[in-house]
C-alpha cells in the first residue's frame, strides 16, 4: 500500500507573491523586495514565515487594509527575522505592484495615496506615463540628526584606515523614518575596500536600539553620492543594495551640514559594489519632510501554497 500523502486539491491559503527590483529600471539590478498584494487575514507569525521563506530578499512588504481612518492602505514590512517600521525599497515596490495590478490607475499624472505605517501615515505617490507606472515617491519624516557617540570606532568597523575618512564632513547619525550612521569617505574607491565587522555596528550608538545600520559614502560629483549600507546582525541583513530610508536620512544629514545640491535634489547611488547598482532621488518637500523617488521592475509573480 502506498502511504505517501498527495497534495490536497484544496488549500487554506493562496498567497500571491511578487518579486520586484526597486530603485532601478534594469532587471536584476537595484534592491529586490517581496510584495504580498493582499496581506489581510495573515497573522504576524505567517507574515514572518513568508518573509523567511523568501530568504534571499531583505524585506517583504504586505499590503493590507488600514485601521487608521486617515489612511487608504497599510504597509507592513518584515525581514527574515523581525518586523521593521519602514522600508523604502519595499514601499516603492508596493506602489509599482499596485499600479501593475490596476489598483492605482493614471494616464500622465501622479496618483497620491495615504498609507499607514508603523511610523505614522505617510503620503506616497505613483507617477504614470501613458498609463504605466513610471516613478514612485515616498514622503518620509522631518529629518533629525544626532552625534554618533562611537564615531571613533567607524574606521575599524569598516576595516578602513582613518585616512579614508573625509575631512569635509564628520561621522554622524540622521533619521527620516529610521536611524542610520553616516560615515563620509574621501573618495568612491574606498567603498570597494570595506570589510565590515557587523557585530560592532551598534558600538556607534550603544544607547539607541533603533540604529538600523552604518552608511559609508563618498561624493561622485556635487549632486551625486555613492554609498553602501550594512546592518547589525539582529536585522538578518548583512548589506542592503539600495536603502530608501537611509537615502532619505542621508539627505537630512547633508542638509544639516550644507552638503545638499543647490537645486535641492540629491542622486544617491548604492549597491554597485554588490553588482546590484541603483539610485534614489532625494529631496525635501514643502512640508519639510524628506522625500525619495525611485523606479522599479517586476521580476516574477507566483503563488505560495501553504
PLM regions with names:
Residues 2-86, 92-306:
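Active-site proximal loop and beta-alpha junction motif in alpha/beta enzyme cores
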Amino acid at each position: 500500500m502506498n502511504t505517501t500523502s498527495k497534495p490536497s486539491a484544496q488549500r487554506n491559503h493562496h498567497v500571491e507573491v511578487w518579486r520586484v527590483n526597486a530603485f532601478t529600471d534594469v532587471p536584476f539590478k537595484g534592491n529586490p523586495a517581496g510584495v504580498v498584494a493582499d496581506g489581510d487575514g495573515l497573522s504576524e507569525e505567517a507574515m514572518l514565515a513568508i518573509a523567511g521563506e523568501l530568504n534571499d530578499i531583505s524585506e517583504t512588504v504586505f499590503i493590507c487594509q488600514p485601521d487608521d481612518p486617515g489612511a487608504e492602505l497599510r504597509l507592513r514590512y518584515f525581514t527574515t527575522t523581525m518586523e521593521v517600521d519602514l522600508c523604502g525599497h519595499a514601499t516603492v515596490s508596493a506602489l509599482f505592484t499596485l499600479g501593475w495590478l490596476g489598483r492605482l490607475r493614471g494616464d500622465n499624472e501622479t496618483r497620491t495615496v495615504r498609507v499607514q505605517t508603523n511610523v505614522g501615515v505617510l503620503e506616497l505617490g505613483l507617477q504614470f506615463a501613458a498609463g504605466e507606472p513610471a516613478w514612485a515617491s515616498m514622503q518620509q519624516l522631518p529629518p533629525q540628526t544626532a552625534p554618533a557617540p562611537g564615531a571613533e570606532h567607524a574606521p575599524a568597523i569598516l576595516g578602513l584606515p582613518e585616512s579614508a575618512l573625509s575631512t569635509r564632513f564628520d561621522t554622524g547619525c540622521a533619521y527620516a523614518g529610521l536611524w542610520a550612521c553616516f560615515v563620509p569617505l574621501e573618495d568612491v574607491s574606498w567603498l570597494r575596500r570595506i570589510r565590515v565587522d557587523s557585530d560592532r555596528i551598534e558600538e556607534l550608538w550603544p544607547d539607541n536600539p533603533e540604529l538600523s545600520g552604518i552608511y559609508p559614502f563618498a561624493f561622485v560629483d556635487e549632486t551625486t553620492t555613492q554609498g553602501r549600507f550594512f546592518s547589525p546582525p539582529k536585522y538578518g541583513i548583512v548589506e542592503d543594495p539600495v536603502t530608501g530610508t537611509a537615502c532619505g536620512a542621508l539627505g537630512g544629514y547633508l542638509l544639516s551640514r550644507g552638503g545638499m545640491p543647490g537645486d535641492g535634489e540629491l542622486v544617491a547611488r548604492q549597491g554597485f559594489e554588490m553588482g546590484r547598482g541603483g539610485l534614489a532621488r532625494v529631496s525635501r518637500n514643502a512640508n519639510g519632510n524628506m522625500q525619495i523617488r525611485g523606479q522599479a521592475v517586476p521580476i516574477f509573480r507566483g503563488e505560495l501554497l501553504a
